[in-house]
């Protein structure tokens, strides 16, 4: 832990109009600094959670507002419980996979970016008679792919919660051809598995293994069957840095006001959520560590079926992995 403590003091100037228009986080925080995770340093294993708690106590802060997804909220639940720290959580993840929460900060913007990407890919797909594949983020939840796929007019939408076959995709492309279409748009979530059941992953130089590569796999397999020229676009971190949509700005503002009100009322260990067109709060234990994937009864699944984005009626949507 740095001494003196490395902090950013919040003041009215931090919250002038420009901040609302920015993507990312000016705090520079992420969920990779899990203090409970054993880190090997000079051959020793270290649990730095006590240092984090000590640093928090030194700052003499009355309460902590934690902003993040299910992973961040789980870490914060553990650290605040151990340190007896007053805590309120706010869901922020483009994956939109926080349990009991309809909309997380960042999600609407990510869907907008993916939709715009499909809008831009369609003309070049038509011009050059290609099958264009767009790989989007979302981890184990298919919310971005499903929503952007419908809004962007994708011909095939693939999400982790739904099993598929390369043959069904190839048949769909051939069907489009028979109707005079010379191109197709496919959107696929990064956690969609290969037909053998394995996830597509990429190993980085630092040894970290992350989701990625399913788009290229699909492109190769589709080409083998249909002889269609395929091109793959991996949208990646573009989804995380765009200018926030009006909906994200509204939700973030509403979450912030509600979280401060909870602290003023001394209601701690709560998470604010967006539900039934407004802000509510739930116990932290109801949310932290759980995920929200696309459900079998999601009305957008029916929309995707009706639009003919591969025949979902012949596929199996397994029971959600969420608790």
Short names for language-model regions:
Residues 24-26, 62-65, 85-91, 130-134, ...:
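Structural motif
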Residues 1-60, 71, 191-199, 205-216, ...:
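A cross-family phosphate/adenosyl-ligand binding-site feature
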Residues 237-244:
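A short beta-alpha structural unit
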Residues 1-132, 140, 156, 179:
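Active-site histidine-anchored catalytic micro-motif
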Residues 55, 63-68, 74-78, 83, ...:
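Accessory alpha-helical/coil subdomains and C-terminal extensions
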Residues 251, 255-264:
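Flexible loop/turn connectors
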Residues 313-319:
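Conserved small/polar residues in nucleotide/adenosyl-binding loops
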């Amino acid at each position: 832990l740095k001494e003196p403590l490395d902090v950013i003091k919040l003041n009215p100037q931090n919250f002038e109009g420009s901040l609302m228009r920015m993507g990312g986080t000016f705090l520079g925080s992420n969920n990779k600094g899990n203090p409970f995770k054993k880190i090997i340093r000079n051959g020793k294993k270290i649990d730095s959670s006590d240092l984090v708690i000590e640093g928090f106590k030194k700052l003499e802060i009355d309460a902590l507002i934690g902003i993040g997804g299910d992973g961040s909220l789980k870490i914060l639940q553990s650290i605040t419980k151990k340190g007896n720290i007053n805590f309120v959580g706010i869901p922020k993840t483009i994956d939109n996979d926080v349990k009991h929460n309809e909309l997380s900060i960042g999600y609407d913007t990510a869907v907008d970016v993916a939709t715009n990407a499909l809008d831009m890919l369609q003309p070049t797909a038509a011009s050059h008679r290609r099958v264009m594949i767009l790989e989007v983020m979302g981890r184990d939840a298919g919310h971005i792919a499903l929503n952007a796929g419908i809004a962007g007019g994708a011909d095939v939408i693939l999400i982790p919660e739904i099993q598929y076959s390369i043959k069904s995709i190839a048949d769909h492309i051939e069907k489009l051809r028979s109707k005079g279409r010379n191109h197709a748009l496919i959107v696929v979530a990064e956690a969609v598995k290969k037909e053998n059941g394995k996830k597509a992953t990429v190993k980085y130089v630092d040894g970290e293994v992350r989701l990625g590569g399913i788009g290229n796999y699909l492109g190769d397999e589709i080409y083998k069957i249909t002889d269609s020229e395929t091109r793959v676009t991996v949208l990646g971190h573009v989804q995380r840095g765009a200018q926030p949509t009006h909906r994200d700005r509204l939700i973030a503002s509403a979450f912030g006001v509600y979280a401060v009100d909870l602290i003023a009322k001394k209601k701690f260990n709560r998470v604010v959520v967006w539900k039934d067109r407004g802000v509510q709060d739930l116990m932290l234990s109801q949310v932290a560590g759980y995920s929200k994937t696309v459900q079998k009864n999601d009305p957008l699944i029916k929309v995707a079926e009706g639009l003919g984005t591969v025949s979902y009626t012949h596929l199996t949507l397994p029971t959600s992995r969420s608790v």
